[in-house]
Amino acid sequence: MAVDYSKAVKCALFCQEVYRNFSTVVFDGLVETPVLISEDSTDTQCAILPENSGITIVFRGSDSSFDWQTNFEFKQERAEFEQQIIQQQIVAQQEQVYPYQQKSSSGALMHRGFVNAYFSIRDQIHEYVSNHEIASVTTTGHSLGGALATLCAVDIQYNFHNKVSIEAYTFGAPKVGNDGFRESFNRRVPNSYRFVYGMDIVAELPRWWQGYRHVDAELRIGSRFSLNFLSARFKDHAIDKYIHLLKTMVG
């Protein structure tokens, strides 16, 4: 599998930039004006970045009010992270749905919370792709944004495969669906690159015993060993960690 690490760095930087004040975010190196999409009811945001004959759709990650640079050595801060980010946004909910129809024979099931968030901005994404002459779409996101980028990739392929090619670059993304979804995604989006840094805890969620499976292709970067095991699992989720190491890999 040939991986474009330069593009991975570019996508990771976009993921970092989209965490800034969303209404005024400026993406470095972008010539054309980005299209910003935001839905307050689900606190879901993405930016469509046009470049040449393609677009990159960058999904904003988990709770923007949370400081990813927090020193997780402190138990109270670690507990706050777990409550706000994991319990409320990532741990599997009881109900799951398939995105294209209520009852499907495919067996593909997906996390309801992720689907609801994506569907709240899906129409605007579809409208843009439908109304513009584009040849390729890249979806990207960090953390929760990675889950939404995964959903968007398979959705765009399903609905616009005759118009565009699709790639996905995600960083520290949680699992999105079950085996049925995994098989469908891998078949539809073969150019998918799921980066996991070190001991990133979010990439392990939701748990396998809840029926969730990761999509391909996993790309492990960074060390999976630390003397401070618990702290490292949270620190390794920061997008800055991904960017720093990917830059060293590009040289």
List the model feature ranges, each with a label.
Residues 1-140, 144-251:
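Non-catalytic, mobile gating and regulatory segments of ester bond hydrolases
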